Swiss-Prot record:
The keyword Cytoplasm applies. Keywords: Amino-acid biosynthesis, Arginine biosynthesis, Cobalt, Cytoplasm, Hydrolase, Metal-binding, Zinc. The active site is at D78, E140. Its cofactor is Zn(2+); Co(2+); glutathione. PANTHER family: ACETYLORNITHINE DEACETYLASE. Zn(2+) 1 binds at H76, D108, E165. This is Acetylornithine deacetylase. Its main location: cytoplasm. InterPro entries: AcOrn-deacetyl (IPR010169), ArgE/DapE_CS (IPR001261), Bact_exopeptidase_dim_dom (IPR036264), Peptidase_M20 (IPR002933), Peptidase_M20_dimer (IPR011650), Peptidase_M20A (IPR050072). GO terms for biological process: L-arginine biosynthetic process. One of its GO terms (cellular component) is cytoplasm.
Amino acid sequence: MKFPEFKDYYQQLISTSSISSTDSSWDEGNAEVINKLAQWCEDLGCEVEIEEIEKGKLNLLAKLGSGEGGLLLAGHTDTVPYDEGRWNYEPHALTEANDRFYGLGTADMKGFFAFILEAIKNINWKDQSKPLYILATCDEETTMLGARHFASNTKIQPDYCIIGEPTSLKPIRGHKGHVANAIRVTGKSGHSSDPAHGVNALEIMNEIMFALMTLKNKLVKEYHNPGFSIPYPTLNLGHIHGGDSPNRICGCCELHYDVRPLPGISLDGLDNMLRDALKEIEAKWPGRIDITPLHEPIPGYECSADSPIVTSTADICGQDVETVNYCTEAPFLQDLCPTLVLGPGSIEQAHQPDEYLAFSFIDPTISILSKLMYKHCF
């Protein structure tokens, strides 16, 4: 059988739109790209399972070989929406220019699957002793639905996992989590000349912001991980809106904030800290304060520095293992087995106009993936 060339894989992945978004006008699902991956994997001898988690939202698990343990190579098939007016290249076409592949998903991260397929083609699998798994998930860019569902329901037990997010081929063994909430204060509007006839939502929010800043300082003092460039949890007040006129008592105010917890800080524990910080204000103003998550919270993630996958992958890549501050699906897959994040392209290209992958990543990525397959499947 004649298999597609590397560039053909890449072209078809990028030209197949698979945008996920909380805005229903953008949200597309990923069925078409999953079906293409399924056919390619089957052509290479893999057993393929496809699961529809929600309508149009699919996960794919491919397995090459048999036995216990092995290696799981994982990634997401969805992309973010795009602003066409800011792109100089067609987002859903693979454009070659400036020694780069341009297109939506070239770095983040549909293109990674082309590297996996190319590495599989280049290996003689005759003496394989452990399975290779390929996981392609849905909705990483929104809810991480695919990874959450897979980690909670799968029966496979690989020895190790590599997630191919763009890390410039530097192995990543940890990152912070992300929690984002909206706090809405409902006051009572009225004319500013008589404050007693109203309840000023901005004044209540001022108390809340002071409490959050106190919590921010507490997080800095009480939690520390020297493995991170910013070694403490961060809390940021990112957006606020309230009121409509200087001579009117503010009847409503809303604040959006986020927290990036270190690995080891549980989401329940963090939520309790946030609630404790506001409990006196909530008691003072009953029924006027609502806290709503802006997305499903993501825990921090850390793979032990002593794990064999850490040392062996660092040797294969010739790079020191690092930690980062952005989020991936790693916290969920780490529940299955020791997990690293490692892939071609730069995170600086993620979610940007004219997203690209430099040609200089192509040969090293195929080489690294081939070595990882030999290391953990033979």
